[in-house]
Amino acid sequence: MQVIETLAEGLKREIKVVIPAKDMEDKMNERLADVKDKIRINGFRPGKVPAAHLKKVYGKSIMADLVNEIVREQPAAILSSRGEKSATQPEIAMTEDKDEADKILTAQQDFEFTLSYEVLPPIELKSVKGIKVTREVIDISDDEVNEQVLKVAESARSYESKTGKAANGDRITMDYVGKVDDEAFEGGTDQGAELVIGSGRFIPGFEDQLVGVKAGEEKTITVTFPADYPAKNLAGKEATFDVTVKDVAAPGAVEINDELASKLGIESADRLKEIVRGQIESQYGSLTRQKLKRQILDQLDEMYKFDTPASLVDAEYNGIWSQVNNDLAQSGKTFEDEDTTEEKAREEYKTLAERRVRLGLVLSEIGEKAGVEVTEDEMQRAIYDQLRQYPGQEKQILEFFRSQPGAAASIRAPIFEEKVIDHLLTEIDVTDKKVTKEELLAEDEGEAKAETKKAAPKKKAAAKSEAAEAGEGEEAAPKKKAAPKKKASEDSAE
């Protein structure tokens, strides 16, 4: 077998592989010799079929098997012998001419194919001893815990029907039909909808007009959808809602006690506070971790500068760009609405994709040298977390992970990355710094920079509680950002 390098340009490689027809024929004859005693052909005793006849009957199929085996096995062997790792699966090209293919299968012509791929760049690891990061630490006060417990209690509070007029804080149960230009619009109708006046869950002006209504009353409410409303067919338009009030209920007293805890399925009020404190600690811990990780990645990004495989960058960029456009479409916005242009956005995301690929390669090399591995238990837990997001589809999801190596890799990658970060935290200089809640939540200069690369958040449309599917109201005004938070985040190298 001849292996000839025909292209070595940057990270691109092209290898021509030639297996002489004589070698292919010899391998075919070996296969025929191995199976001749097992083959049954009418008119011949077992093991007595002439070799020429066997070759005539089975030669092409055996040669086809040999070709498939070579194409399947040799690329990895060739890369290994060259001491190279390909960035993606090598592309394999061979003749598509039927006459040439027939000559190869009959050992009249050498079998040739070409491998095209990009190599992973060699990375010479540098010492991380000079990396210095600050870990922000926050003390959680009893007041903050009590404040959150109170919110939990308010969400679980009971309401009691009343005969008087509705006031701020009362819960209204109602049917309504929304209309624009006297025509009911999709998603603007509901029955038995519940709304706490003053909760801000409906579009501006809607809830205020419910103050003073009574059970059994019918009322027409007039509102104007915000100009930046996600549903463009409703944005800026005046709408009316014909409301029938079914019930007005006053909120019960909020008491944090064992009875409340029991209602929530918790043994005691003290245990409820412990759980809430743990949740707050987890939330702050995640934010601290995110800031810490950003500092590490930023410094690694400064330390390593090398060419990245275009195939990996393109794949990363395409993923980011797809999510950017999906998020913009769902928010009903354009690049101009986000104070940028498509051309500028593409440049930013291309740079971001290159950074993420470069950091991913660096972290991979660091992890490999440090012996970082993702255990089977860690994979199982991560897959279980995925299954919980799709109740009733567990069997299909499991089969998907079993049959698609790429799916398992997408689960493994973030786990591996976090374990490498854990390893780095044992090697670098970490200084703890006590901060306030406001300081922890504040963006530093680096975060503010990255924030400009995140897309407008998805905006729930609601003229009814929790958002009407067709987008007839809003829960919160979106912040102006230019890229999706998850995919465009610089806090990850995945």
Swiss-Prot record:
Its EC number is 5.2.1.8. It catalyses: [protein]-peptidylproline (omega=180) = [protein]-peptidylproline (omega=0). One of its GO terms (cellular component) is cytoplasm. Its main location: cytoplasm. Keywords: Cell cycle, Cell division, Chaperone, Cytoplasm, Isomerase, Rotamase. Residues 169-254 form the PPIase FKBP-type domain. InterPro entries: PPIase_dom_sf, PPIase_FKBP_dom, Trig_fac, Trigger_fac_C, Trigger_fac_C_sf, Trigger_fac_ribosome-bd_bac, Trigger_fac_ribosome-bd_sf, Trigger_fact/SurA_dom_sf. GO terms for biological process: 'de novo' cotranslational protein folding; cell division; chaperone-mediated protein folding; protein transport; protein unfolding. GO terms for molecular function: peptidyl-prolyl cis-trans isomerase activity; protein folding chaperone; ribosome binding. Pfam families: FKBP_C (PF00254), Trigger_C (PF05698), Trigger_N (PF05697). Residues 440-494 are annotated as: Disordered. PROSITE patterns: FKBP_PPIASE (PS50059). It is found in: Cytoplasm. Consists of 3 domains; the N-terminus binds the ribosome, the middle domain has PPIase activity, while the C-terminus has intrinsic chaperone activity on its own. Belongs to the FKBP-type PPIase family. Tig subfamily. Involved in protein export. Acts as a chaperone by maintaining the newly synthesized protein in an open conformation. Functions as a peptidyl-prolyl cis-trans isomerase. This is Trigger factor. It comes from Rhizobium etli (strain ATCC 51251 / DSM 11541 / JCM 21823 / NBRC 15573 / CFN 42). The lineage of its organism: Bacteria, Pseudomonadati, Pseudomonadota, Alphaproteobacteria, Hyphomicrobiales.
